[in-house]
Regions:
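Iron-sulfur cluster-binding electron-transfer modules in prokaryotic oxidoreductases
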Residues: 1-136
Length: 136
């Protein structure tokens, strides 16, 4: 079971998952069940590259940094609690300079599941039985 949090998130569309496999709707449906998902100006087919994708192997470090900073400016504009992504490389790239907590979708769902657990109360603490010691 999951718990819907009052926290907010934006979703970064990873290049391969989105443009490569046309998966845009499903990650948002999942996130909407557990956080308040905010829209960003460039998402889905218009989503921004993280700056470190496999398609950017021809770019130098400065170019990759500029792409990352541009994407983070868009994603952090409305001060969400989380930037969510479904790509470990995008997460690793954004964590370098994000002011917002960057998490994989699975981490956000897991946190929601942890928050939905009912507390367990221990009515009685049983002491362990003393073991008999046999001397030889």
């Amino acid at each position: 079971r999951v718990h819907h949090s009052k926290e907010s998130a934006v979703y970064h569309d990873p290049c391969e998952l989105g443009r490569g496999n046309n998966i845009y709707k499903e990650p948002r449906e999942l996130l909407n069940k557990v956080v308040n998902l905010q829209s960003v100006s460039q998402e889905a087919e218009l989503g921004l590259c993280c700056g470190n994708s496999l398609g950017g192997v021809q770019l130098n470090a400065v170019q990759r940094d500029l792409i990352r900073i541009d994407a983070l400016n868009v994603l952090q504009k409305n001060n969400p609690n989380y930037i969510a992504t479904a790509c470990p490389l995008c997460k690793k790239t954004f964590v370098k300079s994000a002011e917002t907590d960057v998490k994989d979708i699975a981490e956000i769902i897991w946190l929601s599941m942890q928050n939905s657990r009912k507390p367990k109360f221990v009515h009685e603490i049983k002491q362990p039985k003393e073991e008999a010691v046999i001397e030889l």
